Amino acid sequence: MGNNFWSTWSPSQRIFSLIWPATILYLIMKLLIEKMWGKNRGAVERFQTRREALFDDFKSRSAPASLVNNPRIVKGNETAEQIETTFNEILKLDLIALKSALQTDKYNAYTVLCAFVWRAIDVNSEINCITEVIREAFNTAEALDDNYAQTGEKGQLFGLPFSVKSNFYMENYDVTVGLAKLLEQPKTTTCPMVQFLSDQGAVPFCLTNVPQGLLSYVSSNPIYGTTKNPWDFSRTPGGSSGGEAALLAAGGAAFGIGSDLAGSLRIPAAFCGLVTLKPTQDRLCVTDTHGGLPGRGRLGLSFGFYTRSVKEQEFLLGLIVGRSEYLELCPMSSPAKLEKHIEKDQKLVIGWFVDDGFNPVVPSNRRAVEETVKSLQAKGHQVVELKLADVSEEFPPFAVADMLFRNVMPDNGAYMSEMYAGEQYDEHMKLFIRLVCLKQNFLVSFLLRYGVMPFAKLALSKRLACIGSAYNSDLAACRQNQENTDSYKLQWIRYWKSKKIDALICPSFITPAQPFEYPAQLSNGAFITGLFNMLDVPAGVVPVSPVNQKDVDQLIDGFSTEGDLLLKKQREAARGTTGLPNAVQVVTLPNCEEMCLRVMRLVEESAEGVQRLQWRVGASAAPIDVENTPAGVVSSLEHFERVNLLH
């Protein structure tokens, strides 16, 4: 009888009968989410009110006009104009020069902090990179100066203001990672990395923005908003350490600290023109942070610094890695100190590739590697082209990509779905979050893997199909993937040894900085960075010559999309990138950070045309060609000058 009843319905009635229950279910779920978000809305509003009040307070306390006659400002600065001139002098110094000026009493900690706060608040008003200021910063600087006056002693980082990625625990501060449910739950401890740097005399003065839940390379969330790239305000600085990179690139901190689970330090460094190094996980272990994926698979979680030069990286890493004082705070970290290489004239064997076998890179990023390799070869170093397909017959590149994405979500997204439950989804991450939440459902994942994704592989994108079908069906599959990962690591090292190379140079990412809407659509980009977390090897990023117009022109004829939807999106994301930072990635074997830094220095010395942003003081020396310049770049040029670096 039921079948006869169904047969009397028209096709449109049948379709409607299937759609309306799904619609009602969607509306119920939407109502539940909005109700839960409403429960946290009060906390969000209270926080945002406090945040703006503290920004105003810091702006007032650091304004040159308010510091006239302040006895803590270094002598010789009696007027607001003199103080502003001194601030600009301070802000033009690199980290090593600023350290020297502080150690030799040219400046004191309080004056330097005021200079950086003054600049950081202005920068933040344009690019929204700071989530919160650290209330104790001025008291900390005053205490440093007072202690020096009494004892004559200074720590190695005396008075250097630094920024902190907001997933690092700091006592009495929330760690929300952009999730409203985590507001008003201040931490009771400070992470050992921040504590060690503070013990050495550095001054943490602000926390910086991250993606909602950390797991993206667009630094945006409903609590703190979207962070803009200081080179182009219409593009992301990357993520998840995007707020850190944006602030440092804009000159708002002496240095910054961040974490890296699948490229979270390296992608922002590449997008913002900075230097960073992701160490082997245990070489610099850091506890008391939100790692993004507690209980993750075989992925090395690393911590490191953002600087403007390799020399600054060497200084900061040399200060903390293997130091007994740091081991007291974090005993799990390796006791092996960073050694200095003496044999600087020794010629090296450098491996390289431009295609990882999974996802091609756009012409600008390919050229960055090819020019760097050619320059090193001209200086007498031997270069050897590598092919990732030759690493393992058992695991070709697409199988390695599947391995990586299973390691990212060993529980098929269950933890991430719980993390996002009841949250308002960020506008730039909606697609990513919805796909993650869908994937943890067994039935949906089964349909995706055996129904939708085989079709997608043929009709849309084999890369999308690979990502969508990366699923651990049960505990046995999860265990097998971890065994495969361990096996691939060994095969990687054997392949490396067979080529007798000292280091590897490869693309830093698949594109330069992308518009905000693309990271959620281009998870395929994470392979070129996440691979080295899965292998748990040192990987650094060094800026090279910026993107040029020829690179952009070649997107049409020099970058094949293969009819692949994701590659088409990738090409779109790379349009209009002329003048933006470009970079290469340097990789070595596990625990060989010293060699990685050495090759990074060689790359830095061979790079030409690298630029640095500098906050504009006074009118622009040259008019901006508004008609032929992207709007986001125009906004950047109104506030920042581009200064050529000389090595």
Swiss-Prot record:
Activity regulation information from UniProt: Inhibited by the benzodioxole 4-[bis(1,3-benzodioxol-5-yl)-hydroxymethyl]-1-piperidinecarboxylic acid (4-nitrophenyl) ester (JZL184).
Keyword terms of this UniProt record: Hydrolase, Lipid degradation, Lipid metabolism, Serine esterase
GO molecular function annotation: amidase activity; fatty acid amide hydrolase activity; monoacylglycerol lipase activity
Alphabetical list of PROSITE patterns matching this protein: AMIDASES
Superkingdom, natural source: Eukaryota
EC number: 3.1.1.23, 3.5.1.99
Stated family: Belongs to the amidase family.
Protein purpose: Converts monoacylglycerides to free fatty acids and glycerol. Hydrolyzes the endocannabinoid 2-arachidonoylglycerol (2-AG), and thereby regulates the degradation of endocannabinoid-related monoacylglycerides. Also hydrolyzes arachidonoyl ethanolamide (anandamide, or AEA), but with low efficiency. Plays a role in the regulation of longevity and resistance to oxidative stress.
Protein name: Monoglyceride lipase faah-4
Native source species: Caenorhabditis elegans
